[in-house]
Amino acid sequence: MELQEVLHMNGGEGDTSYAKNSSYNLFLIRVKPVLEQCIQELLRANLPNINKCFKVGDLGCASGPNTFSTVRDIVQSIDKVGQEKKNELERPTIQIFLNDLFQNDFNSVFKLLPSFYRNLEKENGRKIGSCLIGAMPGSFYSRLFPEESMHFLHSCYCLHWLSQVPSGLVTELGISVNKGCIYSSKASRPPIQKAYLDQFTKDFTTFLRIHSEELISRGRMLLTFICKEDEFDHPNSMDLLEMSINDLVVEGHLEEEKLDSFNVPIYAPSTEEVKRIVEEEGSFEILYLETFYAPYDAGFSIDDDYQGRSHSPVSCDEHARAAHVASVVRSIYEPILASHFGEAILPDLSHRIAKNAAKVLRSGKGFYDSVIISLAKKPEKADM
């Protein structure tokens, strides 16, 4: 099976779907002020045609209700600028392209469009037709839009996914050189970490180059993705997954060869690596860069119905929080896990993820490290 066929969130609306388990809204709270500033500066710059039709691409939109959280924030930010101007100019039409891989569950996304349009008219007074939303399926590591056609590109929690598993993780004899690991983790040897960094450098450079061509001069890009910060020792979702798969091997429920042959195309860069790649590629100016961390159980509600939870308030809360974390991790990685290990292993794996999540939460290290970076396309010399 081709890698891109399983590189998507768990679709549908079931208990293990991404739509039911994502805590995306909690992360957007941190991103929203930077998003608003990007939109405001774009509109005030009077770029070509922006006051007639504001063109936006959301790269890696995933599926479910969370897809429209960013769209709503973008629309509200645009309209906020119009209100501040206090003039009679009509608000620009907004054209938004939702992008993800072809296997993304776009059906569940567009089933929500009618209610989104109704809420938009109710909350923002925008008539249907003044905000146009469509799909642009395909890899965001390839061309998606015509040259100099877009004003703003946004991507949230996607760019840590690589275009492919790095080369060099298996010898010519088919022996894994990343034993016991599923990505470039702290336990990986330096050559493995370099292979993942090289692949990220190649992919992120391609991403910047291609999408700089799609943006108009001085167009903006806002990116948020997981990162690693040396001063914090926060195991991320991949670390939880790696620990839990190793537990299954130790307990005899999974063959070691299955673990050693499982390499996930994910890399969490440092902020220094991100800055270096942006500067070396050269198309963008870094306007803003911030790191933050959010708790594993962001979005958790004690009212959520997790089966089998204890009746003791304290242990019940701990069990439910850990179960919530396991559900989120499963909703992200289930397609690629099922493809490699088979679906039968998923319930046991989820149980072990919850156990490991509970340990990390008790240790006070249950946080995801993230980076927000705001970029502006450098103007051509003729535009300066």
UniProtKB/Swiss-Prot annotation:
Entries under InterPro entries matching the protein: MeTrfase_7, MeTrfase_capping, SAM-dependent_MTases_sf
Positions bound to Mg(2+): N178, D260, F262, N263
EC top class named in words: transferase
Free-text comment on the cofactor: Binds 1 Mg(2+) ion per subunit.
Biological processes per GO annotation: alkaloid metabolic process; methylation
Keywords from the UniProt entry: Alkaloid metabolism, Magnesium, Metal-binding, Methyltransferase, S-adenosyl-L-methionine, Transferase
GO molecular function: caffeine synthase activity; metal ion binding
EC number(s) stated in the UniProt entry for this protein: 2.1.1.160
Pfam families membership: Methyltransf_7
Domain of life: Eukaryota
Residues where S-adenosyl-L-homocysteine binds: Y18, C61, N66, D100, L101, S139, F140, C156, C158
Disulfide bond residue pairs: none
Pathway membership, UniProt: Alkaloid biosynthesis
Function according to Swiss-Prot or TrEMBL: Involved in the biosynthesis of caffeine. Catalyzes the conversion of 7-methylxanthine to caffeine, likely via theobromine as an intermediate.
Protein name per the record: 3,7-dimethylxanthine N-methyltransferase
UniProt organism field: Coffea canephora (Robusta coffee)
Encoding gene, per UniProt annotation: DXMT
